[in-house]
Amino acid sequence: MDTVVREAVPGDGPGIATLITEEAPHFDLQGYPEDLWPDHLVVLVAEREGHIVGWLEGILDGEYEGSGAPVPPPHGYILAIVVDEEQRHHGIGGDLIEKFMEEALAAKVEWVFLIPEGGEGCEDRVRFFIHSGFTPTEVLDEKRLIMARWT
């Protein structure tokens, strides 16, 4: 089964909303059920056999305001990434990140950051991001970590 990672297009919103509802119900669905999202967002999907099995949302015009930014803005910011639990450990999350990094490079964004979600599974998420080339840059508090990567 091949997985295609691409920019989200009209018609993907309901599939994104379903994925969020099933895999990350604490996330805000925003306008996805109505197939709407802000133009400034980079919205990527992983599609397998006609189903959305992965989703990444980020921005390429952000500004990291902490002390760890090594270059001036714009900075990329990965806001969220979700992969269908049954499809995990097959490279889909990594492929979504690589597609985002390609878009960041094309937009002349040199540095991308993210904040791994805390709580249950946080250590696994941090390991995944390290495996994807991100490194810890700053600790916001005892539970939140900033991770970043050069494009």
Spans of model-derived segments:
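A short beta-loop-alpha structural element at the N-terminal edge
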Residues: 3-16
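Active-site rim helix/loop that mediates acceptor-substrate recognition in acyltransferases
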Residues: 24-49, 65
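Conserved beta-strand in the GNAT
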Residues: 45, 51-62, 77, 82
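A conserved beta-turn-beta hairpin within the catalytic core of GNAT-like acetyltransferases
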Residues: 61-78, 88, 110, 143
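A short, internal acetyl-CoA/4′-phosphopantetheine-binding micro-motif in the GNAT/acyltransferase core
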Residues: 80-88, 117-118
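Conserved acetyl-CoA-binding loop-helix of GNAT-fold acetyltransferases
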Residues: 83, 89-102, 127, 131
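Conserved active-site alpha-helix within GNAT-family acetyltransferase domains
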Residues: 94, 118-138
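Conserved GNAT acetyl-CoA-binding A-motif
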Residues: 104-118
